[in-house]
Amino acid sequence: MINFNVGAWRPTTGQARAARLASANDLVTRTLAQHGLTSGSGTASSHGDGSETMRSALSGLMARLQPDGGPATPPADIPAGAAFAEDAFTCAAGTRRYHTYVPASAREGITGLVVMLHGCTQTPEDFAVGTGMNALAEQHRFVVVYPQQSRGDNAQSCWNWFSRGDQMRDRGEPAILAGLTREVIARHAIPADKVFVAGLSAGAAMAVILGGAYPDLFHAVGAHSGLPAGAAKDVTSAFSAMAGREAGSAPRDTPTRTIVFHGDADATVHPSNGAAIVRQALEGGPAQSLQTDAERAAGGRSYRLSTTYDADGAEAVEHWLIEGLGHAWSGGQPAGSYTDPKGPDASAEMVRFFFSPSS
């Protein structure tokens, strides 16, 4: 028999109250851990105010912005004449390290720059391997930059797309990433109109923020399994946005050239977020536009491709919805984490979209 009166409320003194509060915080932490929202340590905050539990929950929330995958993968062999160097950028908003890949083919002339923002728990090396972007850089003679999120700023190495202080121009992480990009542009004399940004998951959400905040700097965006800018302002709204419920969106005055990839089997970030990115990217554009839809297949997966054209007939936005794909980089390399080798090659299609003659 269960005695429901055992837990009846009774007045407590300071020591007993503190013990109960610690026990409650411990229960919250362990419950969040069961749902993948914390590190699972089960240790409550010694401060007794729940702040550490909330910070742990926040880090765990961002950890959900990644597919199931293995540990980070070391970088692939660098071709003779190429360079994959580490550096750091500092401004008033903070410091971030980054890797720059300069292909051996750059000696024939650099065609542009692609900034690649990794997903949660990933590293620049791992992301480079998984997306295969360095090989495409060799083929097309562009430079690739892989900024690295600091674990001091997010315990799971996630970009803080949901934070109010990291969603606007000249503030927080957008300011750091924009400044970092400008530094690389100047160092390698990169054509100013051939600078693009792409990312996976939390990285995709930050890429979308950058595209809207710095249209003068980033001339197209690639978003894989991400969310629209302004989808969340705090932890609670981030949960809702990821689940496809009550997602917000920051209004825009000008359209942003964007290519979106999302799997229809994504259980981490609901596919409706991909459609929301598309709608946001088209804001500020003409009231009427031409859109085409096609059902196709590549790499063993079917997909639906919706393309919206601008007034000049150029591709303004592409939306790839891939059947059976979870929360992983489509057509990615199995040596990297959080990739699915099946399906269309997201990296190749992004590069094609970025460097198309009409861009």
Q: What is each PLM-predicted segment?
A:
Residues M1-L113, E125-D126, T131, A198, ...:
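A domain-start/cap signature at the N-terminus of enzymes
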Residues A106-A155, G230-A231:
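Short substrate-entry loop that stabilizes the transition state in hydrolases
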Residues V115-T121, S225, H262, E323:
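The conserved beta1-alpha1 loop
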Residues Q148-G172:
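Cap/lid segment of the alpha/beta-hydrolase catalytic domain
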Residues G165-H188, I209:
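Alpha/beta-hydrolase active-site loop
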Residues I185-R187, A192-T254, A267:
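Primarily recognizes the serine-hydrolase "nucleophile elbow" in alpha/beta-hydrolase
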Residues V260-H262, D266:
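Short beta-strand/loop motif that positions the catalytic acidic residue
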Residues T268-N273, S330:
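Conserved alpha/beta-hydrolase "acid-adjacent" motif
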